[in-house]
A protein has these predicted regions:
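Protein-protein interaction regions
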Residues: 20-24, 29, 81-82
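Short hinge/gating elements
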Residues: 25-35, 63-67
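N-terminal basic/disordered segments at the start of proteins
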Residues: 1-23
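Intrinsically disordered, low-complexity, basic-enriched segments
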Residues: 4, 11-13, 32, 54, ...
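C-terminal structural segments of small proteins and small subunits
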Residues: 70-92
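Compact, glycine-rich, soluble single-domain proteins
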Residues: 31-47
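Conserved small/polar residues in nucleotide/adenosyl-binding loops
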Residues: 96-97
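Conserved bacterial/organellar gene-expression machines centered on ribosome-associated P-loop NTPases
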Residues: 43-65
Length: 98
């Protein structure tokens, strides 16, 4: 999925993360700001990159300001920001099979 315009999801509240995506030129440019970067930086990066890969995002500038978010929250924020960048208002994945 192509990042068509800048978009943001999340807040700067405790236990949340603010994720911003912008169009990129070559690959994924990831910037992470977190008070727990030394303990959980690799895990934060993995959650973000896994979500971008699942959504087939190849070129983007991604900024994450983490305030202690869980992996599921990080993934949801990345997904939401990517969908917003494409003006997608409904999740295109069907959950009727569950």
């Amino acid at each position: 999925m192509e990042i068509k315009k800048a978009a943001m999801a999340g807040t700067l509240e405790s236990s949340d993360a603010q994720v911003t995506v912008e169009p990129g030129a070559q690959g994924i440019e990831l910037s992470i700001e977190s008070s727990v970067i030394h303990q959980f930086g690799r895990q934060i990066k993995a959650a973000v990159m896994e979500t971008l890969d699942r959504l087939d995002v190849k070129d983007a500038k991604v900024t994450v300001v983490d305030k202690g978010a869980l992996d599921c929250t990080l993934k949801a924020r990345v997904e939401c920001a990517v969908y917003r960048s494409n003006d997608v208002t409904e999740n295109p994945v069907s959950y009727t099979h569950l």
